[in-house]
Amino acid sequence: MENVVIQTEFIKLQDLLKFTNLVSTGGEAKERIQACEVTVNGEVCTMRGKKIRPGDDVAFQGAHYTVSYADP
């Protein structure tokens, strides 16, 4: 499991997938999320705008990420 550090209160799920280079475009993120390929905290998530906050776990195609916060 890898750690993703954000400097904001949250990051949208589709933006997290792009930020971690799991997908290359927002369109691809939308497709993957709507195809039920992404889990958040162990549950399938189909909301691409879901707010991912520090402490959340995101998994996609065998990659697992935990989000943490760093003061700006």
Predicted regions and their residues:
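A detector for short, charged/polar N-terminal pre-domain segments
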Residues: 1-11, 67
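Intrinsically disordered, low-complexity regions of eukaryotic proteins
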Residues: 4, 39, 58-59
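C-terminal structural segments of small proteins and small subunits
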Residues: 45-72
